[in-house]
Amino acid sequence: MPLIRDIHQRFWRLPQLPWLELRTTSESRQAYKRHSPPQLSLGAIIAGETRCISNGQEYLLRPGELILIPPQSPHSCNPLHERPRSYHMLYLDADWCLTQLPHLPADSRLHTTQPQLQNPQLFQLYQQIVTSITQQQTAGLPALIIHLLRALPLQSADAEPPCAISRQLVARLVSNLQKPPTLDTLAQEFALRKETLIRTFKQDTGLTPVSFTNMARIEYARHRLRAGDDIADVAYQTGFADQSHFHKTFVSYTAATPRQYAQNRSISDNK
């Protein structure tokens, strides 16, 4: 399998449109750990096949198909039989999306019952958006994205909000990403067994406390890398023992190296 540093991929961010990010990846066999980005994610399969698991359901994605992942929805999208696949992934800020969906309450949690989309018209519109972003043609781009967004099968989630324990646990976990509390410490603080904490939290979030913490650290790292912080500083800010540990964890959740993400371009000499 090619090294992650040799995979041709690029991240596109436009300063005048801070609510969007585009990723383009070619011929990658790199797998992802289960993750739950805070943005609305819309992927397009260009070549190869991808196996996506979301909300306990498995979807086989082929070229010409889209995959719609609501914000904070745990999922994994990985190559089938370790064969290479090429794809785009468009990330849209969740709050911005809600402002463009007036039929939904402003405090909605976005949800879909149809994540796999086999719609040639939507796929063509998606490709038009990708072309506009990669050529930095911003005039008319917001209107195209809003048109696409409003055509997606999105609803407001009817699910019950997380229980008090999970809400408190989230607040505790993100309060100090540089030195997150151990499960033993949390069990003592909440006067609960570790197994009970893990089970309750996973029922509400789809992730274990450890996975949630790693996701929060990587999301904060992405934010600091976009801001231009040095990779070694970001590794320290997010509480990793060393840069190697940070690199390995970042790759496992994003299928990209910190340097690829920070430099916003595809390079073949990432370390």
Identify what each model region corresponds to.
Residues 121-132, 165-176, 220, 224-227:
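Solvent-exposed, amphipathic alpha-helical segments
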Residues 101-160, 171:
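Amphipathic alpha-helical segments enriched in hydrophobic/aromatic residues interleaved with Lys/Arg
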Residues 64, 197, 201, 245-246, ...:
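Short hydrophobic/aromatic patch on the recognition helix
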Residues 9-107:
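N-terminal regulatory/effector-sensing and dimerization cores
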Residues 176-180, 208-209, 229, 257-258:
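Short helix/strand-capping hinge loops at secondary-structure junctions
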Residues 189, 193-194, 241-242:
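Short coil turns linking two alpha-helices in DNA-binding domains
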Residues 156-165, 207-213:
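Short, Lys/Arg-enriched anionic-surface-contact patches
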Residues 171, 184, 202-247, 263-271:
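Terminal helix-turn-helix DNA-binding modules in bacterial transcription factors
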